[in-house]
Design a protein with these regions (language model features):
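Rossmann-fold NAD(P)-binding glycine/threonine-rich loop
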Residues: 122-165, 169
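Single conserved hydrophobic/aromatic residue that forms the stacking wall/gate
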Residues: 1-15
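NAD(P)+-binding Rossmann beta1-loop-alpha1 motif at the extreme N-terminus of oxidoreductases
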Residues: 17-68
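Hydrophobic Val/Ile/Leu positions in short beta-strands of Rossmann-like dinucleotide-binding domains
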Residues: 13, 30-31, 179
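Rossmann-fold NAD(P)-dependent oxidoreductase module
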Residues: 40, 44, 148, 193
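Rossmann-like NAD(P)-binding element
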Residues: 73, 77, 81-117, 124-129
């Protein structure tokens, strides 16, 4: 049997730090790395041995993002580039821009993504009703990215249900990550990266299933609004084989 357990801040975080990696790994380019999610992933993956590149629409914005990152985590090395150059430099590329900029950003860097894994964290929230599920006509933001980029890019959707600002803290996050994508090997590589960042990832099937993870975000927002828990997330439970 497999189930889903809701977790909140009082049970989701333990007072222990994640282990740091020592071996050099792929260069990770984070496009739109100015928010909590991009910053938190940069910190955690740098500790795990990845070289980090922060991309933005302009070099100045990228440099400002790196400066802000260093204020939070001075020991995290990161290079600033425009999105186009960052996508070229990254062996694995992560898209963390707001949903309204997803398509334009991907279109501008598409030629530099061929043969690579693109981790798409987009959640298609539509203000002001962010607590209501409003998926795009394509079915999900993840599927929209895959259709836009074509099969030569391995789109993997993940991180939609993580309380992003917690990633910047030096703590273990017990909330799980649902990972969808059409290539199992690409999903597995992303799951390994999730584990290196101190979380647990699960194979959740093809990119069509990204709709479920994206929709869950609005449900978690409603649960947070209840005041019973904060930073709610999910935990996959079941009997191990």
């Amino acid at each position: 049997e497999i189930g889903v357990r809701l977790v909140g801040s009082e049970m989701c975080i333990r007072d222990r730090v994640m282990s740091e990696g020592s071996n050099a790994k792929e260069t990770v380019a984070i496009l739109g790395g100015t928010g909590d999610l991009g910053t938190g992933l940069a910190i955690r993956w740098s500790k795990a041995g990845h070289k980090i590149v922060i991309g933005s629409r302009t070099l100045e914005k990228a440099q400002a993002a790196v400066a802000a990152l260093h204020e939070i985590s001075p020991e995290t090395p990161a290079e600033a580039m425009e999105n186009f150059d960052a996508a070229k430099a990254g062996e694995i590329v992560v898209l963390t821009v707001p949903a309204e900029h997803q398509e334009s950003t991907l279109s501008s860097v598409k030629e530099n993504l061929t043969g690579k894994i693109l981790i798409d964290v987009t959640v298609p929230l539509v203000p002001p009703k962010v607590g209501t599920v409003q998926l795009p006509p394509e079915g999900s933001a993840g599927k929209r990215a895959q259709e836009l980029l074509g099969e030569e890019v391995m789109v993997v959707s993940a991180f939609q249900n993580i309380a992003a600002h917690l990633l910047k803290e030096d703590i273990q996050i017990e909330c799980d990550v649902l990972v969808t994508g059409n290539k199992k090997a690409a999903r597995q590589r992303v799951i390994e990266m999730i584990e290196s960042a101190g979380m647990v990832g699960w194979h959740a099937g093809p990119i069509d299933n990204a709709a479920a993870a994206e929709a869950l975000t609005s449900i978690l927002i409603q649960i947070n609004r209840s005041g019973i828990v904060s930073h709610s997330g999910i935990k996959i439970i079941g009997q191990e084989h």
